[in-house]
């Protein structure tokens, strides 16, 4: 009986690590200013750290207690802006590295596990279709943003560490794609933003000797950011993601993701072309799976 419960625990570990690999570039789909208007020819290099800690909601009928997960995540990102058909476009590449630990008490036995390695690389291509022309640095100084409409495609590339014979993995061993549409509206010092996207996944054909499929996951975000004269800004962030039912060798898991998160962001310049950003977010509602909080710190260097 204990062996069965251990298998169930390992399966839940796999699902949780699986979603850790899908959603974050630096955090879980809380990305304010993703469609911000900036000059073309801008290069941005960022290095960040994210700490995540939380508990796992399990079936009450299972003898599982104190199921917790903790991870330390580091990532580097590069962003390049350019003109495309006189519209502002950008490409972003992010590569995370993760240290994860988990533990649970099953039938009065302590079970622990850990993983270390690269997670899946993310590449984002976006273009602002309306309200954001491709301007050089001198032209940009006199431009005033009103309403921006943009689209993007995020691609998750299976570069993460993965073992086909283990339930706990950092990598996902499959590709994922998220087309997204976003709107950004300026109200004096306040920038209001809303994004909507859907994650689509290819199959993982090496999941413990089985084929693992996942239905699309919908993602909605909303952000409100207040800018000060020195380009320091603070923001309120929220996201809702739902769907994502999994199927292993044709057998469906009826549980789906239905999670709502809220958080805040603070960014301030520290020198010419340099800034630091801090973000905190927490689960406001979680129907199943991992209910966690995350704290991140990012250093950013911009140049032309």
Language-model segments: residues:
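Hydrophobic, lipid-facing positions within transmembrane beta-strands of outer-membrane proteins
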Residues: 43-45, 72-76, 119-123, 149, ...
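Surface-exposed strand-loop-strand hairpins of Gram-negative outer-membrane beta-barrel proteins
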Residues: 52-73, 111, 164-168
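Transmembrane beta-barrel strands of outer-membrane/channel proteins
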Residues: 45-51, 91-99, 149-157, 194-200, ...
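Outer-membrane beta-barrel biogenesis signature
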Residues: 25-46, 131-145, 304
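Residue-level signature of outer-membrane beta-barrel architecture
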Residues: 49, 80-82, 127-129, 155, ...
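Outer membrane beta-barrel transmembrane domains
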Residues: 211-304
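Repeated loop/turn-to-beta-strand initiation elements of outer-membrane beta-barrel proteins
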Residues: 55-56, 86-89, 132-133, 189-192, ...
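Outer-membrane pore/translocation modules
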Residues: 99-213, 255
């Amino acid at each position: 009986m204990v062996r069965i419960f251990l298998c169930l625990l390992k399966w839940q570990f796999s699902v949780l690590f699986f979603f850790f690999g899908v959603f974050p570039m630096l955090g879980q789909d809380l990305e304010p200013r993703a469609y911000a208007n900036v000059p073309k020819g801008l290069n941005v290099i960022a290095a960040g750290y994210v700490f995540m800690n939380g508990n796992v909601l399990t079936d009450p009928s299972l003898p599982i207690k104190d199921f917790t997960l903790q991870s330390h995540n580091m990532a580097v990102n590069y962003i390049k802006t350019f003109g495309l058909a006189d519209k502002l476009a950008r490409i972003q590449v992010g590569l995370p590295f993760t240290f994860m630990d988990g533990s649970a008490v099953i039938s009065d036995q302590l079970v622990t596990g850990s993983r270390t390695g690269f997670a899946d690389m993310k590449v984002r291509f976006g273009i602002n279709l309306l309200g954001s022309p491709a301007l050089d640095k001198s032209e940009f100084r006199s431009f005033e943003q009103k309403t921006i409409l943009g689209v993007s495609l995020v691609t998750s590339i299976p570069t993460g560490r993965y073992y086909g014979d283990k339930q706990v993995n950092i990598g996902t061993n499959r590709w994922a794609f998220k087309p997204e549409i976003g709107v950004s509206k300026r109200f004096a010092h306040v920038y209001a933003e809303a994004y909507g996207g859907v994650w689509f996944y290819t199959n993982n054909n090496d999941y413990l000797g089985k084929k693992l499929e996942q239905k699309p996951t919908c993602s909605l975000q909303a952000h409100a950011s207040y800018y000060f004269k020195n380009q320091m800004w603070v923001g309120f962030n929220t996201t809702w993601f739902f769907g994502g039912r999994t199927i292993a060798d044709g057998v469906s898991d009826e549980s789906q993701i239905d999670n709502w998160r809220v958080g805040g962001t603070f960014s301030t310049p520290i020198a010419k072309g340099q800034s630091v950003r801090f973000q905190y977010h927490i689960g406001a509602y979680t129907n199943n799976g991992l209910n966690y909080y995350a704290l991140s710190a990012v250093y950013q260097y911009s140049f032309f």
